[in-house]
Regions:
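Positively charged n-region of N-terminal signal peptides that target proteins for export
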Residues: 1-4
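Trp- and acidic/polar-enriched beta-sheet ligand-binding modules for extracellular glycan
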Residues: 20, 38, 42, 79-82, ...
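N-terminal signal peptide c-region/cleavage motif recognized by signal peptidases
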Residues: 12-16
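A short beta-strand element within beta-rich, extracytoplasmic domains
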Residues: 95-117
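Disordered, acidic Ser/Thr/Pro-rich linker "stalks" and the adjacent N-terminal cap
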Residues: 19-89, 117
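Sec-dependent N-terminal signal peptides
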Residues: 7-9
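Exposed beta-strand and adjacent loop surfaces of beta-rich binding modules
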Residues: 48, 100, 122-126
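Extracellular and analogous surface-interaction loops
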Residues: 83-101, 152-156
Length: 188
């Protein structure tokens, strides 16, 4: 009896550990307009480095996701692509344990209605913190800001927040999806 129970536990535990994380529904907000780009975010506490990792490729820096420009977009999103946000390896002591609690995203290439429809948009992502999956996020197919909130994570130097594209809304012309802006929220 004990061997059977042990065997069942050995078979069941990996499946339980691999269970899908909680699903967060993004909240659709106000329109994205150039005049309102910028403002306070986690960047008020410290900067971070953003990179894209496409399947089978090395990381590539991405500068368009937090450039406060509604006319630029990262246009290489495909299922399996990852975005990584690495916090500085050295932070002043008082900035360790800075609250990080979500992000705002302008999904798609929102430069115009026509361009928005031509590119795909990200439909669902999986969020990771230091390599551990903690949530999936469902995004709406809209040109408006979308807000994603989760329980506070106390960010520390060298930490890495990342997201993997799980699903996309197809574009009419291009096979890839786009993201215009992605702003990490926290610090206060």
């Amino acid at each position: 009896m004990t061997r059977r129970l042990l065997l069942l536990l050995c078979l069941a535990l990996p499946r339980l550990a691999a269970a899908d994380p909680q699903l967060i529904q993004a909240v659709v907000g106000h329109p994205v307009v150039q005049e309102l780009m910028g403002g306070c975010s986690l960047r008020c506490a410290f900067p971070w480095e953003t990179a894209a990792i496409l399947p089978g490729k090395p990381p590539v820096p991405v500068y368009t996701l937090d450039d406060n420009d509604a006319d630029t977009a990262w246009t290489d999103a495909v299922v399996g692509a990852k975005l990584t946000f690495q916090f500085p390896k050295k932070l002043p002591k008082e900035l360790n344990d800075t609250p990080f609690y979500g992000f705002d995203i302008a999904d798609g290439n929102i430069k115009s209605d026509s361009i928005f429809k031509q590119y795909g948009r990200v439909k669902k992502v999986r969020l990771f913190y230091n390599g551990r999956a903690f949530a999936d996020v469902a995004l709406a197919d809209t040109r408006r800001w979308q807000e994603v909130s989760f329980d506070d994570i106390m960010a520390r130097q060298g930490d890495i927040f990342s997201m993997e594209v799980l699903e996309v809304y197809p574009g009419a012309k291009y096979p890839t999806a786009a993201i215009t802006e992605l702003i990490l929220q926290g610090a206060h």
